[in-house]
Amino acid sequence: MGNEKARVGIIGASGYGGIQLVRLLLEHPQVELTYLAGHSSAGKPYSDLYPHLTHRVNLTIEPIDLEAIASRCDAVFLGLPNGLACDMAPALLAKGCKVLDLSADYRFRNLNTYTEWYKKDRQDQATNNQAVYGLPELYRDAIRDAQLIGCPGCYPTASLLALSPLLKQGFIVPETAIIDAKSGTSGGGREAKVNMLLAEAEGSLGAYGVAKHRHTPEIEQIASDLAGTELRVQFTPHLIPMVRGILATVYATLRDPGLVRDDLITIYSAFYRASPFVKILPHGVYPQTKWAWGTNLCYIGIEVDPRTGRVIVLSAIDNLVKGQAGQAVQCLNLMMGWEESLGLPQLAFYP
């Protein structure tokens, strides 16, 4: 595209993921934000939804008009509830737009798995076959050549970055993998929910979606690819009383009980040597969610328990940035041939 900025639109910009996209794209040196679209909020100035942006964003949320969007955008982010993107992506792709879907619609190669977990029948297998899973640390080259990206969920991002070196190189017994993950309340979105009320969430910690969370098959699909065999993982998410961040703690049995922590730190550092957003911590240092706030970083700490023969990997991300909007922009950078880290923050809000 030469020195011209890419024209980018967002369909579904009213939620927390949407405003993260708006923030990142407004500050991106190669992007012009040209279209914000939505259903219930159509006709409203974007600053009506987020008044602190009154002096920065002068766009009005427009109706979802695929013809207009395609004529005004080179790339489109779909920040819609599950089950809607698959009705829009084929038309946008046919009109030449690059599409990055933040919902679950294009994360699964097997649409029967999607239907089983998300309860929507699909008739777009041909379009689905074009989709690339948007985890750059694993699929960087495929993302560069893609027109359609299925952006990963927040829990799968944190979990898979923790697990990938172990599975890819066969260091663990795959079926022993257990993922214990904790997320802030922004992961539940902006709509009012009783369990997200301050009076309900403050001072409380609880699990949800036990043995049935929708991110489970997403994790299993990629983990199976890495391991070279179909596998199941035990995944349990928890809600904690903070706004943003995910900490995933992964446990697995080592094939070689002689592996020590320093060996694994070296292995992880080599695995992610070309990944600018993954930071492997030195021995004895374990990540905290606040370190990643507002950034596209993933911090990983590693430990081995010689008594049990298990490895323990801790992964911390910002669920709204590396777990959602930031990772989507990272994919856009690759699709457009730009520097992968362009326009993405690497310094946290601290404290």
Curated annotation (Swiss-Prot):
Pfam families: Semialdhyde_dh (PF01118), Semialdhyde_dhC_1 (PF22698). One of its GO terms (biological process) is L-arginine biosynthetic process. Pathway: Amino-acid biosynthesis; L-arginine biosynthesis; N(2)-acetyl-L-ornithine from L-glutamate: step 3/4. The active site is at C154. Keywords: Amino-acid biosynthesis, Arginine biosynthesis, Cytoplasm, NADP, Oxidoreductase. GO terms for cellular component: cytoplasm. Its main location: cytoplasm. InterPro entries: AGPR_AS, AGPR_type-1, NAD(P)-bd_dom_sf, NAGSA_dehydrogenase, Semialdehyde_DH_NAD-bd. CDD domains: AGPR_1_C, AGPR_1_N. PROSITE patterns: ARGC. Its EC number is 1.2.1.38. It is found in: Cytoplasm. GO terms for molecular function: N-acetyl-gamma-glutamyl-phosphate reductase activity; NAD binding; NADP+ binding. It catalyses: N-acetyl-L-glutamate 5-semialdehyde + phosphate + NADP(+) = N-acetyl-L-glutamyl 5-phosphate + NADPH + H(+). PANTHER family: N-ACETYL-GAMMA-GLUTAMYL-PHOSPHATE REDUCTASE, CHLOROPLASTIC-RELATED, N-ACETYL-GAMMA-GLUTAMYL-PHOSPHATE REDUCTASE, CHLOROPLASTIC-RELATED-RELATED. Belongs to the NAGSA dehydrogenase family. Type 1 subfamily. Catalyzes the NADPH-dependent reduction of N-acetyl-5-glutamyl phosphate to yield N-acetyl-L-glutamate 5-semialdehyde. This is N-acetyl-gamma-glutamyl-phosphate reductase. It comes from Synechocystis sp. (strain ATCC 27184 / PCC 6803 / Kazusa).
